[in-house]
Regions:
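Short glycine-rich His-centered loop
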Residues: 27-52
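Alpha-to-beta junction loops
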Residues: 30, 66-67, 84-92, 136-137, ...
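Beta->alpha turn/N-cap motifs
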Residues: 33-37, 71-76, 85-97, 120-121, ...
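Periplasmic-binding protein-like
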Residues: 34-35, 100, 111-121, 184, ...
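Short helix-initiation/N-cap motifs at beta->coil->alpha
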Residues: 37, 54-55, 69-80, 125, ...
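Acidic, polar ligand-binding/catalytic clefts
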Residues: 54, 58, 62-132, 195-205
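Extended ligand-binding regions for polar small-molecule ligands
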Residues: 54-64, 121-124, 131, 136-137, ...
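Transmembrane alpha-helices and adjacent helix-loop boundaries
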Residues: 142, 254-473
Length: 473
């Protein structure tokens, strides 16, 4: 129990110190975007956020006398984060739609664009408009309005949803899709800067007004944003920002497709350190909770029976529901910041699986071992500590190590709540370099470099326990 207290203390300390999203100070203007939508938001060759939306966000913060803080998060969860009060506004090229206006209020539009179909220059399917794409695969980024438009207006088109433009570009280069639909300005800019053989075809599918959503309970902030946008239009600031990224013959000073090797290495290593930190904290929390949970799953007599059924129901629920849903529930439903939400979710998930492993280990010990220890006059605690637990633990080591490996891999899920772990950092690099195969491979090898030794370590620990006489064949 002494070690358990130490482990739990370290876990709670990690929870307190590791949160990258401190509560917003009143003087801060906290905005969200994806960081994967160049030229509106992306990481430059030094690894810093840049782009049209980034500049607009900082300019608005300056004009409303607040300090700008920009959070990069996943697009498919960005509105949920706003409604959960994780940030003040979204300045991420969000189109104003009636469905979105039901849950948030939008500023006046700060630019106009439209949806455009792009295909490979070779155009093997010979399509020149979206109406000719029936039965063909057209890609969009998950969560964008183009997906709903195509599904509603062109139900015979097979809509393929992917996480980023880089993944779409890779699919189209391999000709696994016919084309993709995206913002006309964004698509043209990305294709040019990434040097891909894609061309727009047909007319714009529809026009879009792009605004800044805020929560409906924050009309004062909405008024300040609208005032700032109007002033930026009047004094030419908005036009200058637009020229910086879209002016004739102009490109961003941080050209897309390039990122310093040292910056790439730093981002990957920092992201992996975050992944390992989350995994370690969740493992410690999960193991501390798994031991008593495993005992309660094993013993169901007398006064322990109600607790047994309570723990059994909880463990079955955790094991029977997707980790991603649990993560979103803890983050949005409980209102926790990303790091505590990730550690708590993965820790409880690990507890559920490790508790079952411990239960199986305890039940595999020959009952005669406990009877023999009882005949020698050992107390129940001593029988457990010196006879039952060493044998059960040895049996449980290989599956427990599998739980550790699975937990480390599950950290890849936490990118959806804006934690800059390894996969999120790899995606930010891919959004600039458009080389998904290379950087996903590197990320996979980094995980393997840790998980493979862990699998071998389990064999060594098992042999060590046997050699010290804690267990036998």
């Amino acid at each position: 129990m002494h070690y358990a207290r130490i482990i739990l203390t370290l876990t709670l300390a990690f929870l307190a110190l590791a949160d990258p999203w401190p509560a917003a100070a009143e003087e801060e203007f906290v905005t969200a975007l994806t960081g994967k939508f160049p030229p509106f938001s992306y990481y430059d060759n030094q690894g810093n956020l840049a782009g049209f939306d980034v500049d607009v966000s900082r300019e608005i913060a300056l004009r409303i006398n607040r300090e700008s803080r920009i959070i990069a998060t996943e697009w498919d969860g960005i509105l949920a984060g706003l409604l959960a009060e994780k940030y003040d506004a979204i300045i991420g090229s969000m189109a104003i739609t009636p469905a979105r206006q039901e849950s948030v209020d939008f500023s006046t539009p700060y630019y106009h664009s439209g949806a455009q179909l792009f295909v490979h220059r070779d155009n093997p399917d010979k399509v020149y408009s979206i109406s000719e794409c029936n039965g063909l695969r057209i890609a969009v980024v998950l969560g964008e309005t183009y997906q709903h438009f195509l599904e509603e207006k062109f139900p015979d088109v097979e809509v393929v949803t992917l996480k980023s433009a880089a993944e779409i570009f890779a699919m189209l280069e391999q000709k696994r899709i016919t084309g993709f639909v995206t913002d006309r300005l964004v698509g043209a800019w990305q294709v040019k800067e990434a040097g891909r053989p894609f061309v727009p075809v047909g007319e714009m599918l529809y026009k879009e007004r792009i605004g800044i959503p805020v929560r409906k309970d924050n009309p004062d902030l909405l008024g300040q944003i609208n005032t700032a946008l109007a002033a930026m239009e009047d004094d030419g600031t908005m036009q200058r920002i637009h020229q910086r990224y879209f002016g004739l013959g102009k490109t961003s000073s941080s050209k897309l497709g390039t990122m310093e090797p040292s910056v790439i290495a730093t981002k990957l290593l920092k992201g992996f350190a975050v992944s390992l930190g989350i995994a370690l904290a969740a493992l410690l929390l999960g193991f501390v909770l798994a031991i008593p949970s495993g005992l309660l799953l094993t013993f169901q007599r007398g006064s322990l029976k109600p607790l047994h059924f309570l723990v059994r129901g909880f463990v079955d629920f955790i094991r029977g529901t997707p980790v991603l849903i649990q993560l979103l529930f803890v983050w949005l439903g409980l209102g926790l910041s990303p790091f505590p939400a990730a550690i708590l979710t993965l820790g409880i998930c690990a507890m559920a699986y490790m508790a079952e492993v411990i239960r199986a280990g305890l039940m595999s010990v020959d009952p005669g071992q406990d009877l023999g220890a009882r005949a020698l006059g050992l107390s129940p605690l001593d029988r457990f500590r010196f006879v039952v637990w060493p044998q059960a633990f040895r049996i449980a080591i290989p599956p427990l190590m599998n739980c550790v490996v699975a937990l480390l891999k599950d950290t890849a899920l936490v990118s959806i709540i804006s934690i800059p772990e390894l996969i999120r950092e790899a995606q930010s690099i891919i959004s600039v370099t458009f080389e998904p195969g290379l950087y996903y491979l590197i990320a996979g090898l980094m995980f393997f470099a840790v998980t493979f030794p862990l699998m071998k370590l389990s064999d060594r620990v098992e042999r060590s326990i046997k050699a010290k006489g804690f267990a036998h064949d």
